[in-house]
UniProtKB/Swiss-Prot annotation:
It comes from Mus musculus (Mouse). Belongs to the CAF1 family. Divalent metal cations. Mg(2+) is the most probable. Its cofactor is Mg(2+). One of its GO terms (biological process) is nuclear-transcribed mRNA catabolic process, nonsense-mediated decay. The gene is Parn. The modification Phosphoserine is found at S523, S543, S569, S573, S575, S605, S609, S613. Transmembrane segments: none annotated. Its EC number is 3.1.13.4. It catalyses: Exonucleolytic cleavage of poly(A) to 5'-AMP. Residues 551-612 are annotated as: Disordered. This is Poly(A)-specific ribonuclease PARN.
Length: 624
């Protein structure tokens, strides 16, 4: 079901009903871009730590807009042994509620827009008909403004006891307004008077003056023309009629506030249900959803984890599930489209699914990929097929595994990390995996270097894997850890490049953080303000500059790599990543404190809980 601004309110009860009845939900988002700086390859480095990946996405991806949100609710019909679905495709856009409401700035990435356009995406439905939204802080501020405005209006009695001080340059204007109102009140024919459009300050003076001069007998309100011009309308009313109009105005303003909260109400309903939320490669979806509809992401990864669990108590990533035993050996491609096709084949059994009455059905043969509602739908199908496969391995077999089964608990709250070679997931409920990286080197070099140059440099060390960090640094993984020190020693006298172990790289990075923290703790803010920003002794991955050009060194790339394209041509789009990625693929690819988290937890009456007891049969491995 397509939901835009014009039909959002009339269909909101259907959305709430679907959420209330569902066993679980599948979600998906479409964005205005992926990365505002580094290429997608650099954004998803193969040796990122979970903290580094979070910081990269937070810094380079959150200024894009999630402008289409897909939600598919799944409910199992025990009578007919089938899943009944209700799919929604929401177009979302942060249209300002009023002149005082947030005017959101966002960025677009040309490759992402071009790709969505090629898929038939209707951008007019976003920008002309998108559903507005507010995050919790924006909603709170608007409600405070509304309450303050009403208290000022209701407190006019206090102001009415004394005349209003009118600036000299506005006295003539106010005198003319009072003269018009006096003539209006003397007239028996006119029931209302429209004043000419004026400034906000002049309207305020009019309100205050009329509250003092005419405490009874008139009703004053501000209306807006089609040209967005605001003017005051004055009506003759008795006290009973005045109170009735004031109540109507209050009700209308409350309704407009709820309309401004808009799509966020759907996210709040999903969160408050406490039910399982399924996504595919869903880290960005979760980050954008929290960032846009709740609050800006915290600076610290651990705070983000708390916040994510607070908003969505149970998350499951089908990409991680498909990349884990017992699926890993029988599923070769975990991109969403290919996964959906594979799960229709032996040994899997595709589920029986039917759309609820009044909801359009999707045909997987038509492959409406990159429509968020359709992607959410097939994500849910993939989850059901894999969950039922786990059930088929039991003795006796269980043909239908519910969203509350302990069989799938090992996959809860672990989000797939794209292209990280040895850390498959971000663990929202505890510490992340810390693999040994004693076979990994950190290399800095001139920005002219290409992938082929690195392959030649390490040609004596056998098979290697390269993961670019930026234009002047990369991680190189050797096949044998004992060769690491040899490689480091060979670079001691090199002028154009530098090699250090992964442990040394991390140590210097931590040292830099400690120095930076010490400056803050010692309150050297005055010094910092008076002179240009100076970095601590941290060894930055992009700080190495070659003493000279390559000079007479002649690079002869290994024949195996002769066909390699230049580094610049290796950037790939998000859609290409989705087509080729796997967790073992060697290809490179305002802070809120705990008080705010507690307040969020209090505001969100989250139903349901995640059991701490692990499943016995299947476990997401601690090592990869």
């Amino acid at each position: 079901m397509e939901i835009i601004r014009s039909n959002f309110k009339i269909n909101l009860h259907k959305v709430y009903q679907a959420i209330e009845e569902a066993d679980f939900f599948a979600i998906d988002g479409e964005f205005s871009g992926i990365s505002d700086g580094p290429s997608v390859t650099a954004l998803t480095s193969g040796f990122d730590t979970p903290e580094e990946r979070y910081q990269k996405l937070k810094k380079h991806s959150m200024d894009f807009l999630l402008f289409q949100f897909g939600l598919c609710a799944f409910k199992y019909d025990h009578t007919d042994s089938k899943h009944v679905t209700k799919s929604f495709n929401f177009y979302v856009f942060p249209k300002p509620f009023s002149r005082s409401s947030p005017d959101v700035k966002f960025v677009c990435q040309s490759s992402s827009i071009d790709f969505l356009a090629s898929q038939g995406f209707d951008f007019n439905k976003v920008f002309c008909s998108g559903i507005p939204y507010l995050n919790q802080e924006e909603e709170r501020q608007l409600r405070e403004q509304f309450d303050e405005k009403r208290s000022q209006a209701n407190g006019a009695g206090a102001l009415a006891k004394c005349p209003v001080t009118i600036p000299e340059d506005q006295k003539k204007f106010i005198d003319q307004v009072i003269e018009k109102i006096e003539d209006f009140l003397q007239s028996e024919e006119k029931r209302s008077l429209e004043l000419d459009p004026c400034t906000g300050f002049q309207r305020k003076l009019i309100y205050q003056t009329l509250s003092w001069k005419y405490p009874k007998g008139i009703h004053v309100e501000t209306l807006e023309t089609d040209k967005k011009e605001r003017h005051i309308v004055i009506s003759k009313v008795d006290e009973e009629e005045r109170k009735r109009r004031e109540q109507e105005k209050y009700t209308k303003e409350q309704e407009e506030l709820n309309d401004a909260v808009g799509f966020s109400r759907v996210i709040h309903a999903i969160a408050n249900s406490g039910k399982l939320v399924v996504g595919h490669n869903m880290l960005l979806d979760v980050m954008h959803t929290i960032h846009q509809f709740y609050c800006p992401l915290p600076a610290d990864l651990n705070e983000f984890k708390e916040m994510a669990i607070c908003v969505f108590p149970r998350l499951l990533d089908t990409k991680l599930m498909a990349s884990t035993q017992p699926f890993k050996d029988i599923i070769n491609n975990t991109s969403l489209a290919e996964l959906e096709k594979r799960l229709k084949e032996t040994p899997f059994d595709p589920p029986k699914v039917e759309s609820a009455e009044g909801f359009p059905s999707y045909d997987t043969a038509s492959e409406q990929l990159h429509e968020a509602g359709y992607d959410a739908y097939i994500t849910g199908l993939c989850f059901i097929s894999m969950a039922n496969y786990l059930g088929s391995l039991l003795s006796p077999p269980k043909m239908c595994v519910s969203a509350r089964s302990k069989l799938i608990e090992p996959f809860f709250n672990k989000l797939f990390l794209m292209r990280v070679m040895d850390i498959p997931y971000l663990n929202l409920e505890g510490p992340d995996l810390q693999p040994k990286r004693d076979h990994v080197l950190h290399v800095t070099f001139p920005k002219e270097w290409k992938t082929s140059d690195l392959y030649q440099l390490f040609s004596a060390f056998g098979n290697i894997q390269i993961s670019w960090i930026d234009d002047t640094s990369a991680f190189v993984s050797l096949s044998q850890p004992e060769q690491v020190q040899i490689a480091v020693n060979t670079s001691k006298y090199a002028e154009s490049y530098r090699i250090q172990t992964y442990a040394e790289y991390v140590g210097k990075k931590q040292e830099g953080k400690q120095v930076k923290r010490k400056w803050t703790e010692d309150s050297w803010k005055e010094v910092d303000r008076k002179r240009p920003h100076m970095q601590g002794p941290c060894y930055h991955s992009n700080s190495f500059t070659a003493a000279g050009v390559l000079g007479k060194r002649t690079l002869s790339p290994d024949p195996r790599e002769a066909a390699l394209e230049d580094r610049e041509s290796e950037e790939v789009s998000d859609s290409e990543l989705e087509q080729t990625d796997s967790c073992t693929d060697p290809l490179p690819e305002g802070r809120k404190k705990s008080k705010k988290l507690k307040r969020m937890k209090k505001e969100l009456s989250l139903a349901g809980s995640v059991s701490d007891s692990p499943a016995v049969l299947f476990e997401v491995p601690d090592t990869w």
